[in-house]
Structure formats: C-alpha cells, structure tokens
C-alpha cells in the first residue's frame, strides 16, 4: 500500500528550482518521484514517496539544490500519510 510510505514535498518559486530539487531528490535517495503541482503565482510543489529515512534525505538534498538555483518556499515530510491523501496526489504513470 502506497500510504505506508512517507510523502516528501518541496515547494519552490519557479520551475527551474523545482526541477533541480526533483533531480537532487531522486539521485540522493531511493525515492519515487510522484509528480509536481503548479499551484499558481509561480509556485511549484514536487513530491516524492519512499521510506521515512530516504524521503528525509531526499528532501534535505532537494531543498539545498533548489536554494542554489531559485527560491525555496517550503519543505515538509509526512511520515505515514492517511491512505485517503492519495486521492489528491498526482497519479504515477507506469511508463
């Protein structure tokens, strides 16, 4: 069940910082990129799933990378999100 995995989120102002954060997160730890949400006003949130330790390491690396190239707004890890949270997350394609 996907909800057993932690959910990590990084929000940036601008797409470049979000892409840099996503790249750093998947390179830093064994996490799966869930997707991105463009919230409006230039805010972009990138999300990853994995075990708690991996997601924490990934968001730390992603936040540092985003700060180097853009504006970091927020970083948050939910250790065990309720399964109903999956309904509002982007769907992961099986490509």
Swiss-Prot record:
Pathway: Amine and polyamine degradation; ethanolamine degradation. PROSITE patterns: BMC_1 (PS01139), BMC_2 (PS51930). The keyword Ubl conjugation does not apply. Keywords: Bacterial microcompartment. The keyword Secreted does not apply. InterPro entries: Bact_microcomp_CS (IPR020808), BMC_dom (IPR000249), BMC_shell (IPR050575), CcmK-like_sf (IPR037233), CcmK/CsoS1_BMC (IPR044872). Its main location: other. One of its GO terms (biological process) is ethanolamine catabolic process. One of its GO terms (cellular component) is bacterial microcompartment. A component of the bacterial microcompartment (BMC) shell dedicated to ethanolamine degradation. Each homohexamer has a central pore with an opening of up to 9.0 Angstroms. Expression of the eut operon may allow this bacteria to use ethanolamine as a carbon, nitrogen and energy source. The pore probably allows metabolite passage into and out of the BMC. Belongs to the bacterial microcompartments protein family. This is Bacterial microcompartment shell protein EutM. It comes from Clostridioides difficile (strain 630) (Peptoclostridium difficile). The lineage of its organism: Bacteria, Bacillati, Bacillota, Clostridia, Peptostreptococcales.
